[in-house]
């Protein structure tokens, strides 16, 4: 239920071009949720990138249930913009997050920040990003859904044992911790919202407006058409959508 609440709050009360969840709201409704530290846009990665102290990093990481590291290709733009000098520098950022997780006893998970399924699908994302004004739209990061073997190869610099831990063991542990649930109780239907009294309210509103236009006694053709439309809407459970 907390996940539903947060999604609703984000879209209805905290929409700033994109849905947002304030930290205070997340803390209020955190029970039952598992929260990771995110990609390079997350506060932990950026703090590591800034070279913050270990004390500061631990304070930030304390918020999260697991820490994330990603393939260095995901963050190659940091080399293009001069923030990081080499690929080894990108690996060092991941190594620091791994060391932080080990020290704090938090699982570290290798995630892909997947935006598309196949490598060739990068073309479509580049088109979308170009339309949104990104200067480097054609220099797409390899954000496709990698296989287990590909991820093990990506993180081989951590050593075989640690690579298997972050690529296989810890992701499976997180997945096993997630409750299986259905978003809808029934697999059939259109899942329109339902409000108490919606059927009567819709019918009364329609009749009131019709009488305002045509008078106390509705013409037969109007009454038949009104009945047909209302019966279709109400009969299919869509009354609430029209209010």
Segments and roles (model prediction):
Residues 5-121, 208-243:
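Domain-core and long-helix interface of multi-subunit machines
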Residues 30-34, 63, 131-152, 178-185, ...:
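Short, compositionally biased low-complexity segments
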Residues 97-109, 114-121, 126-181:
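Phosphate/diphosphate-binding loops
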Residues 26-27, 83, 124-125, 138, ...:
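Short amphipathic alpha-helical patches
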Residues 16-21, 52, 143-146, 158-162, ...:
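Short coil/turn linker and secondary-structure boundary residues
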Residues 110, 160-243:
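Non-catalytic structural connector segments
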Residues 1-19, 136-153:
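Metal-dependent DNA phosphodiester-chemistry modules and their immediately adjacent helices/loops
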């Amino acid at each position: 239920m907390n996940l539903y609440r947060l999604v609703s709050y984000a879209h209805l009360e905290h929409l700033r071009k994109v849905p947002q969840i304030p930290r205070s709201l997340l803390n209020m409704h955190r029970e039952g949720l598992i929260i990771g530290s995110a990609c390079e846009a997350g506060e932990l990665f950026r703090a590591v990138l800034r070279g913050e102290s270990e004390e500061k990093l631990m304070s930030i990481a304390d918020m999260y249930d697991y820490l994330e590291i990603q393939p260095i290709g995901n963050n190659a733009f940091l080399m293009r913009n001069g923030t990081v000098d080499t690929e080894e520098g990108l690996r060092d950022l991941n190594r620091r997050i791994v060391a932080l997780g080990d020290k704090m006893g938090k699982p570290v998970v290798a995630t892909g920040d997947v935006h598309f399924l196949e490598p060739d699908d990068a073309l479509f994302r580049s088109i979308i990003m170009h339309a949104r004004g990104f200067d480097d739209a054609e220099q797409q990061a390899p954000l496709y859904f990698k296989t287990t073997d590909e991820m093990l190869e990506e993180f081989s610099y951590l050593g075989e044992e640690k690579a298997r831990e972050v690529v296989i063991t810890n992701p499976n542990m997180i997945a096993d911790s997630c409750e299986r649930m259905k978003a809808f109780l029934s697999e059939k239907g259109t899942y329109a919202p339902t409000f108490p009294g919606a059927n009567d309210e819709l019918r009364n509103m329609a009749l009131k407006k019709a009488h305002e236009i045509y008078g106390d006694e509705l013409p037969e053709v109007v009454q038949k058409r009104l009945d047909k439309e209302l019966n279709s809407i109400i009969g299919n459970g869509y009354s609430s959508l029209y209010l």
